[in-house]
């Protein structure tokens, strides 16, 4: 099954983009986009990354200091998927970000900037001391934006943002 995922017109990205945890209605489109990035991934493995957690339960997870993981998507109001990333927080106060996928040349900088804001906000909400972003190549355009947000390279494929003073 082929899913049309590349914005054809700049006006498609000018509408409000929502950064939310993936819902049940977004599984098919999000999985198709994820498979383009990781073609060997099966649906079962993809769903293991997803916690089906509402944003309201996030604060409950933070209070209980349990492990939390989810797939976060960027979508427009008409449910067009603009990008995704997976995140995992553990009780060691680390937020781990993997699999940042933002296809197409149109609007991807806007989506990445909103992802960065969301990542930092969720790290603060979960009271994490560090955010580690994996699978980032040295000359990747993602890395430039993340480094502008304060990320430091700790190894060739990982950036880290320190949230504690």
Q: Where do the model's predicted regions map?
A:
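Conserved acetyl-CoA binding element of GNAT-fold acetyltransferases
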Residues: 92-105
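C-terminal "cap" of GNAT-fold acetyltransferases
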Residues: 138, 149-165
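A short helix-loop-beta-strand connector motif used in the catalytic cores of GNAT acetyltransferases and
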Residues: 59-73
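Conserved acetyl-CoA-binding loop-helix of GNAT-fold acetyltransferases
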Residues: 107-121
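Conserved GNAT-fold acetyl-CoA-binding loop/helix
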Residues: 38-60
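Conserved beta-strand-loop-alpha-helix junction that forms the acyl-donor binding cleft
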Residues: 132-143, 160
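A short beta-loop-alpha structural element at the N-terminal edge
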Residues: 4-41
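Conserved beta-strand in the GNAT
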Residues: 73, 79-88, 96
């Amino acid at each position: 099954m082929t899913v049309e995922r590349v914005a054809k017109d700049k006006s498609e990205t000018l509408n409000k983009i929502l950064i939310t945890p993936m819902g049940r209605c977004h599984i098919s489109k999000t999985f198709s986009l994820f498979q383009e990035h990781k073609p060997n991934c099966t649906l079962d493995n993809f769903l293991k990354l997803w916690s089906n957690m509402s944003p309201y339960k996030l604060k409950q997870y933070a209070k209980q200091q349990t492990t939390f993981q989810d797939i976060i998507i960027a979508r427009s109001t008409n449910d067009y998927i603009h990008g995704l990333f997976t995140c995992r927080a553990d009780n060691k106060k680390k937020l781990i970000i993997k699999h940042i996928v933002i296809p197409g040349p149109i609007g991807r900088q806007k989506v990445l900037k909103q992802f960065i804001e969301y990542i930092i906000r969720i790290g603060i909400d979960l009271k994490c001391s560090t955010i580690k972003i994996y699978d980032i190549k040295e000359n990747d355009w993602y890395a430039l934006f993340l480094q502008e947000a304060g990320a430091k390279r700790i190894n060739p494929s990982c950036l880290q943002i320190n949230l504690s003073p």
